[in-house]
Amino acid sequence: MEQIRVEKTASRGIVVEKVYMYLEPDLTPATGTIADDQVQAEIEKFAAAKNAVVEELGQLAEKNEIFAAHLEIANDFMLQDGVESKIKDSKSNVEQAISNTIDEFAMIFASMDDEYMKERAADVRDIGKRMMAVVKGVKLPDLGVLTEPVVVMAKDMYPSDTVKINPALVKGIITEEGGVTSHVSIIAKSLGIPTLVGVKGILSKVDDGEYICMDAGEGVIVVKPDEETEKEYLDKKAAYEQERARLEGLRNTPAVTKDGKRIYLCANVGNVQDIRNALPMNIDGVGLFRSEFLYMQNTHFPTEEEQFVVYKEAAELASQELTIRTLDIGGDKELSYYEFEKEENPFLGWRAIRISLDMKDMFKEQLRAILRASAFGHVRIMFPMIIAMEELKNAKALVKECMKELDERGQAYDKNIEMGMMIETPASVMLADEFAKEADFFSIGTNDLTQYILVVDRGNKKIAKMYDYFNPAVVRAIKQVIEAGHKEGIKVGMCGEMAGDQKAVELLLDLGLDEFSMSAGSIDYVREQILNRE
């Protein structure tokens, strides 16, 4: 018997079940170069593989929005150009050309600091895997063949792997790679499947069909458990399921503290599917819609109409509140179709609202789309990375311009739409009392705020322990912002990781926070803490 401790808990739960090894065929690209007279044939092989993958993704996209982004990537002209140029110029065979181009694309995402964006590298590799399988003429594994309950164990799992997950049969998931913001983690949470990711070397320690015990909440895997350990985990599982049922029973109870304060529980999302996944939690709305993913998963700056379609659907789903953060790129978030100048310190450079105010036509396309969507639900506009009153006023002025343009077109929108801002820099904290007179609401972004206040790169493992939003300097900043907002009568929310941290709930309630916005998987636990608050 061996006990393995794991750091990355993607989805809580306890399982005692046998393992199903979900292993891919060998997709290692063939080596060697090609002759000049083979170039056209290799390009045609790629075209056939691409067309087959695009057709398959198109069918999947009709069932699940996640694959709409895959479809955009598969159709990306830069991907096609990258593969074809390697075949023509480097005389790479088609397998090598696909592999190298996919690696380059994936590295763009993998090098990003933001965990959610870092995980999008897996989406790119998913497309590469599909193309390679077509070229090699091999079949990929299929969870649809399962006939009995198992814990699925894999090197990694991509969105296409998750399509056929049946929660009645897939009782747990363990992967050697991946992070807590990967698609498999997000889908596992939405389906209530216990999941552990980033478990290095696990495939070499377990045999197919072997029973294991798994506590995804505590981050523990027991390999080759004895009878006594199995019974212990079965008892823990029964107790856990009873607790989950109790928490789910609280979902229809509004988050009101025992002293009568109504707290708003919202979800952070990156797309419409995320909203659907969060709705069963009985959320009070969406506290953060990351609009940048519409841009990053595209092959061009999305048009007003393309954005409107998405925002409209989101507004209809999150009818109580949909807070759309305007484009937040720069820093570690790049666009495949727009070349950013190299900067010494991109996190301190041209990013977020600075880009939007410099690229006014692009910004107004987004603002008009948001305004039009506001006719279909309670939509709020939130500006990121504001550090000066001039930025906030200029952004609001552009909204007013867009309103006039929509009036001229005769298109409906909420004439009283709320316009707020992220508080995520020391400057915005120090000027919070002034901003509160101009903004309709605040949302504290503790991820960047903590990084900037403490001068700590949260992606740097050497100083990761210093990244701590419980640091008194950060707590004082949060207190100052909440007090400034309340003095002017505006709502103050939080959409950073701290909002979903159970250890932080009591403190944030003490400070007077009005709205907690977090990943859907944390909402049940935070709700209970709020209800028990004296």
Annotated model-derived regions:
Residues 244-534:
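Conserved alpha/beta-domain cores
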